[in-house]
Design a protein with these regions (language model features):
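Nucleotide/phosphate-binding sheet-loop regions of phosphoryl- and nucleotidyl-transfer enzymes
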Residues: 1-388, 421-424, 431-436, 442, ...
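A signal for specific C-terminal beta-sheet/loop modules enriched in small/flexible residues
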Residues: 283-285, 347-352, 447-448, 513-528
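C-terminal domain-closing interface element
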Residues: 333-335, 490-538, 544
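Protease-associated
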Residues: 357-441, 503-508, 520, 524-528, ...
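Conserved structured catalytic cores and adjacent interaction surfaces
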Residues: 393, 397-492, 501, 564
Length: 602
């Protein structure tokens, strides 16, 4: 019989293909003796089987899930569905590749009216009990039954307005009990049946919902953008709840062992008291910096710092962690190698070598070459970018950052640039005739076209920032204006483009030039030291060739001569040659082209 379910004590970090990244790391943390609430993982193979069985969980998988629940009951001393001493669980997704925020989570599963009443009395904390229940109804309705969050948020906002408070935490137990009743009524109105009270039914529906979320639109987009195969499937992690919302001696947080933006070595993260995990991410309340946790929970913070050190030393990489503090006791809910900027990736890789955790070869292998490309182009000033909000997003067709005054024709781009203006060329689409304007512009924005359009290909070749295919733009070329995000832009107005992300910003955001120095220089030096291939460049002009040599190229590998004929009168001679109807006409055109080409190579 196939094994579809693994307890955390049965897995390890090497089983991520089967257990997913989250499940494998929960098992690894358990093996390391760290404080992890116990649970089990339903494998990625079970997800694949679910789809093969027509989006149904078969009896064999269902049986193994319930066997694992029995084992959890034995470990915890609690009973699933029992009113007196209930086992409450979270149900989370966990693909083998990290997909933050792409799939779904359900907390506090196992609650019903009877259990909540008992918990309310037994804990002496009715507010906590009803808060858990209203959260569970909202999550289950949204994730499992696809009743939108907005309906429940509207009820919460109405309740806060009636009570004259601004924060969810200011609602008392009676308020939350009323909300739970309103939520159940909303559920019945939308679904046509009562909210399920049987924890086993709740669990199976939640597992199916997580499997389903592997195929949701945002997960599909993320997989496509990050080359993650659909066939991998997701695992499901069922874990005993640790409660961060039981009072002021409880809390929840997300932290990195190093700063994911800069790579600086030091704890970076956020923390909320009397809250559950999604509150930090959702921005329901403004979280505190992780350092403030030391004042609130000194013992838990001391233990957390030790856990961070253990995990980073064990994984030999910067870690991204989720945790909960329940009555001063620390529980680890997740760890994974943290996402980071290209700049941070370089610093972290170099620091890990200096700290003796990685070899030079390993440090080079840690760097995603696709991210390095963004460092070779001008970048927005980090502080200024943090304060800016994009007004639209299209295709990041050519990396880098650009800001300047809007122009609508290639000729205007040349003219404005010659008098010292920095310009962004905005076109419906570009053509070869626009090449001079494209060269004069700081950046290019097109309404039509994709990653392989003329604008994208030429811009990448020139190292010019380009955002293409912004279909939200309503263009009026005749009057030199366009409308975007409800605002009308005219020639001379300022915009900023991020060719790495495709984001478009109103106004000017300061940029800084890229340099190969510091950590970038060290990594590239190590790459040169250990590589077995020579690196040459594609270059069509002396300026391109010079820049390539500055960036480490050893010579010219490809020179596409046709690109030399995009400028001035050259393109006319080239067209004469192509359109020539007689040998004499062709030879006459070639006679014009030959000295130009000879001059380029000389």
């Amino acid at each position: 019989m196939a094994k579809w379910v693994y307890m955390f004590t049965e897995g390890n970090a090497d089983m991520r293909n089967l257990l997913g990244g989250k499940g494998a790391n929960l098992a690894e943390m358990t093996n390391l003796g760290l404080p992890v609430p116990q649970g089990f993982t339903v494998t990625t193979e079970a997800c694949t089987q679910y789809y093969e069985d027509g989006r149904q969980i078969n009896d064999e998988i269902m049986g193994q899930i319930m066997e694992a629940i029995d084992k959890m009951e034995g470990i915890t001393g609690k009973k699933f569905g029992d009113a007196k001493n209930p086992l409450l669980v979270s149900v989370r997704s966990g693909a083998r590749a990290s997909m933050p925020g792409m799939m779904d989570t359900i907390l506090n599963l196992g609650l019903n009216e009877e259990v909540v009443e008992t918990l309310s009395q037994a804990s002496g904390n009715p507010r906590w009990a009803w808060d858990c229940y209203r959260r569970f109804i909202q999550m289950f309705s949204d994730v499992v039954m696809e009743v939108g969050k907005k309906y429940f948020e509207e009820l919460i906002d109405k309740m806060k307005e009636e009570k004259g408070v601004k924060q969810d935490v200011d609602l008392d137990a009676d308020d939350l009990k009323k909300l739970a009743e309103q939520f159940k009524a909303e559920y019945k109105a939308k679904i046509g049946e009562d909210f399920p009270t049987d924890p086993k039914v709740q669990l199976m529906e939640a597992v199916k919902a997580v499997f389903r979320s592997w195929d949701n639109p945002r997960a599909n987009v993320y997989r496509r953008d990050n080359d993650i195969p659909y066939s991998w499937g997701t695992a499901v992690n069922v874990q005993m709840m640790a409660f961060g919302n039981m009072g002021d001696d409880c809390g929840t947080g997300v932290a990195f062992t190093r700063d994911p933006a800069t790579g600086e070595n030091g704890l970076f993260g956020e923390f909320l008291t009397n809250a559950q995990g999604e509150d930090v991410v959702a921005g329901v309340r403004t979280p505190m910096h992780i350092s403030e946790m030391e004042e609130k929970f000194p013992e838990a913070f001391k233990q957390f710092k030790e856990v961070c050190k253990t995990l980073e030393t064990h994984y030999r990489d910067m870690q991204d962690m989720e945790f909960t503090v329940e009555h001063g006791k620390l529980y680890m809910l997740q760890t994974r190698n943290g996402k980071r900027t290209a700049k941070a990736a370089l610093k972290i890789a170099c620091d890990l070598v200096d700290e003796g955790m990685r070899t030079e070869e390993e440090a080079v292998a840690m760097i995603d070459p696709r991210n390095l490309d963004s460092l070779l182009h001008p970048q927005f000033d980090a502080k200024a970018l943090k304060e800016a909000t994009p007004m639209a997003k299209a295709l990041g067709a050519s990396p880098g950052a650009a800001c300047g005054k809007i122009v609508f024709t290639a000729d205007d781009a040349v003219e404005w640039a010659e008098r010292g203006e920095k310009v962004v060329l905005v076109r419906l689409e570009t053509s070869p005739e626009d090449i001079t304007g494209m060269k004069s512009a700081q950046g290019i924005l097109t309404v039509r076209g994709g990653m392989t359009s003329h604008a994208a290909v030429v811009a990448r070749g020139m190292g010019t920032c380009c955002v293409s295919g912004c279909g939200d733009i309503v263009m009026d070329e005749a009057n030199k204006k366009f409308t975007l995000a409800g605002k009308e832009y005219h020639e001379g107005d300022c915009i900023s483009l991020d060719g790495s992300t495709g984001c478009i910003y109103d106004g000017l955001i300061p940029t800084v030039d890229a340099t190969i120095a510091g950590e970038f220089g060290r990594i590239m030096g190590w790459a040169d030291k250990y590589r077995t291939m020579k690196v040459r460049t594609n270059a069509d002009t002396p300026a391109d060739a010079k820049k390539a040599r500055e960036l480490g190229a050893e010579g010219i590998g490809l020179c596409r001569t046709e690109h030399m004929f995009f400028e001035g009168n050259r393109i006319d001679a080239f067209r004469e040659m192509i359109c020539a109807e007689t040998v004499e006409e062709r030879e006459a055109a070639l006679a014009k082209i030959l000295p130009e080409q000879q001059g380029d190579f000389e």
